[in-house]
């Protein structure tokens, strides 16, 4: 290396280097504190006095801790995917209303099919629970038909068995007393008999849509989706809603199927299936039932904010109902699918899945036992339907307020019942009784709709703005300050550490690869200063100050040579001698 390059390298080495190229972390931190835009870090360096510097260190560390705490809260709030709710009020259309009679079939139509069942039931109840007659008479009259050799047709088809809790899987025949092994339950097959009830609409001269329900027979839906236009009302109150007088016909109630009298009503969307048996409201006879509605429409956010579905396409359960998706439809479809898989047939109260048949005792004699076992597992959430089915993200819910009043009153029934009987004409062959009638009023309490809409409480933009607010509040930082912090603490900081480690690794590798060199000969020494080594570089002032003093006791190895040129001789010495000699002569 040339002498000039060596001098330049030594000067560069001795000069202090700051900034990102600083050789140590201490110098880097000092440079950052002096040049950063944040206030606290600079005050730590420029403050004079130990107490003041300690105070600024405490203030700065406290501010940093508060920033980290607030930012952590913001991050946690962002990832909790919370929502905010906005409530709006607006007008909506009139909903669909489905009305069903509690009694599904006319008793006069199916009575001849149940004659044997009725007679044998009376005899069984008489033998089991007894009547006011004496015990001997009851025992003498019990099952006299059996002693005469008459076999009941109903018992011949379906045996009457007595089950004991201590003997599971076994039962005793009620007539013969013999024990039988039982693997399921058997009931009579239902007949396809439908009962159509008359209706009277007051205020709305419109036709109702017939709807057959498997549990309640013929039902009627008002303002259904099959209509050309969906009806709406322009005012709220009981006078501007649906008013219906229902003919219940209590005499035609089947005592073996129902034990109460009245009707059921359900309010739902036009594209929604009416689950009357689940959420229906019962209407009492001889009463006027007023139902005030208040509509709430909800819109929920899907993943990741909630476990809801938009249209049920992401739910692995096939919708067997001809209606829009809902949680109830999914649960019933799941149960019916499990019923077909495990029992081999479908339950009659729900729609039929593709390539399946309804259960009957000829082809599936043990289907009832399988049904009850499956229903018990469904209620205990062992089938997995509750975990698979999701709630709909958007749905409508009507909040109902029900009030009752006696109808018709004692004073008005004298003229009202004959008028209603005359209005029915040939459809009713008897004089109406008030227990055969029920009046229903359905109306909006007000025409305002409450809409509940979910929106993300924390978005990316709001998270960044909250970060900026916290940094600006506690340390007067901006985006530029954040970039400086990232550059110094996450780039330059680790770059210095990496350079130092790399330099150490190179030196270690060079020492390991270099061959062992012999001992260097003693460097030549000067005569006047034997400690000074001969170097190609020119001496500098700093290097001269660091040299050790010359040793005074050390004698040079060889005497200095005698040079004639160094001897001083006067040119006129001989002449002076000659002159002196001439004078002497």
UniProtKB/Swiss-Prot annotation:
Glycans are attached at residues 207, 433. Keywords: Cell membrane, Disulfide bond, Glycoprotein, Ion channel, Ion transport, Membrane, Phosphoprotein, Sodium, Sodium channel, Sodium transport, Transmembrane, Transmembrane helix, Transport, Ubl conjugation. InterPro entries: ENaC, ENaC_chordates, ENaC_CS. It catalyses: Na(+)(in) = Na(+)(out). Its main location: membrane. Residues 1-55, 499-585 are cytoplasmic. One of its GO terms (molecular function) is ligand-gated sodium channel activity. Phosphorylated on serine and threonine residues. Aldosterone and insulin increase the basal level of phosphorylation. The record marks 138-139, 181-182 as: Cleavage. The chain crosses the membrane at residues 56-76, 478-498. It holds the Pfam family ASC. PANTHER family: AMILORIDE-SENSITIVE SODIUM CHANNEL SUBUNIT GAMMA (PTHR11690:SF19), AMILORIDE-SENSITIVE SODIUM CHANNEL-RELATED (PTHR11690). Belongs to the amiloride-sensitive sodium channel (TC 1.A.6) family. SCNN1G subfamily. This is Epithelial sodium channel subunit gamma. The gene is SCNN1G.
